[in-house]
Design a protein with these regions (language model features):
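Glycine- and acidic/polar-rich repeat regions and solenoidal domains
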Residues: 1-107
Length: 107
């Protein structure tokens, strides 16, 4: 885990996805190319970088099955944060994204 760019990256999922009980201590905490993620009981000490994926339609499924319900773009922004602690990163000025929930300001 030495010299990694970010703590976590999620790519092209329509959810649900759960990230719980983590310590995200890198200046570049979370890169999100997805939607439908719940972040619960985490310490988040870096920047959050959100992306829309509007050039790649991907399948999504009916609940509780692997049957494909259709295809859609990832418009992002549909994430939930519950009981997290946010701190200002030490450094990370070269990291993309915003501090805490500032990344969601445009949604």
């Amino acid at each position: 885990m030495h010299h990694n760019v970010r703590d976590v990256m999620i790519e092209v999922t329509h959810g649900p996805c759960l990230l719980d009980n983590n310590v995200f201590a890198s200046p570049c905490t979370f890169q999100q190319f997805a939607q439908g993620t719940a972040l619960v009981h985490n310490l988040i000490a870096g920047r959050i970088d959100l992306h829309r994926v509007m050039d790649r339609s991907t399948p999504y499924h009916f609940p509780h099955t692997t049957e494909v319900a259709g295809c859609a773009f990832v418009s992002g922004g549909d994430d939930r944060y519950y009981n997290n602690v946010f701190t200002r990163p030490d450094g990370g000025e070269d990291c993309p994204g915003e501090i805490a929930l500032g990344a969601y300001a445009g949604y």
